[in-house]
Swiss-Prot record:
Residues 141-176, 185-218 form the EF-hand domain. Residues 197-218 are annotated as: Disordered. This is Peptidyl-prolyl cis-trans isomerase FKBP7. Ca(2+) 2 binds at D198, N200, D202, E209. It comes from Mus musculus (Mouse). Its main location: endoplasmic reticulum.
Length: 218
């Protein structure tokens, strides 16, 4: 799993914002958490700023209809995101605090910590909808996005990351990973990194681009 977390250095750089529709008056509502399974051995639990790797399914609490399944996207790979900074809706940020790798939870999220009065996804999530998520957390690691990581990748110290430098960094992580991927997968990851972060298209990722945030709702 280590590789997946390292990749999020690049793939998780989008903007941080609270869920739509949240107000101070509504903030008294609570996210309800039911622990379905928690491993006996848990040496590390999730906290704000950690990089998580997880699958989750989303349902409308009203009728149980499913509106989201992470297993049906990205060839079934678990999602990568930094906890507590708005990469996911606020209710999930709250619900996934203090989780162990291998833990499963069922959570109920009120509208104020989800999509509020606006709803989302062309009617799939109606206004003022309470949501239910089933979450499975695979692993937790310290969030890697930092100037130190940038410098580690920037081997020639020219203050920009080339494809060759990032490819080398990824290759080292592939060698450490318990489930190594083939070259085609590594190439696809590299292309995705530049697609999402090389905003001026010059073939390099600058310090500014490295820290540019984009938005991803779920």
């Amino acid at each position: 799993m280590n590789l997946l977390f390292r990749l999020a250095v690049f793939l998780s750089l989008w903007c941080c914002s609270d869920a739509q529709g949240q107000t101070k008056e509504e903030s008294t509502e609570e996210v309800k958490i039911e622990v379905l399974h928690r491993p006996e051995n848990c040496s590390k639990t999730s906290r704000k700023g950690d990089l998580l790797n997880a699958h989750y399914d989303g349902y409308l609490a009203k009728d149980g209809s499913k509106f989201y399944c992470s297993r049906t996207q990205d060839e079934g790979h678990p999602k990568w995101f930094v906890l507590g900074v708005g990469h996911v809706i606020k209710g999930l940020d709250i619900a996934m605090m203090d989780m162990c790798p291998g833990e499963k939870r069922k959570v109920i999220i009120p509208p104020s910590f989800a999509y509020g009065k606006e709803g989302y996804a062309e009617g799939k999530i109606p206004p003022n909808a309470t949501l239910m998520f089933e979450i499975e957390l695979y692993a937790v690691t310290k969030g890697p996005r930092s100037i130190e990581t940038f410098k580690q990748i920037d081997t020639d110290n020219d203050r920009q990351l080339s494809k060759a430098e990032i490819e080398l960094y990824l290759q080292k992580d592939f060698e450490k990973d318990a489930n190594p991927r083939d070259k085609s997968y590594q190439k696809a990851v590299l292309e995705d990194i530049f697609k999402k972060n090389d905003h001026n298209g010059d073939g390099f990722i600058s310090p500014k681009e490295y820290n540019v945030h984009q938005h991803d709702e779920l």
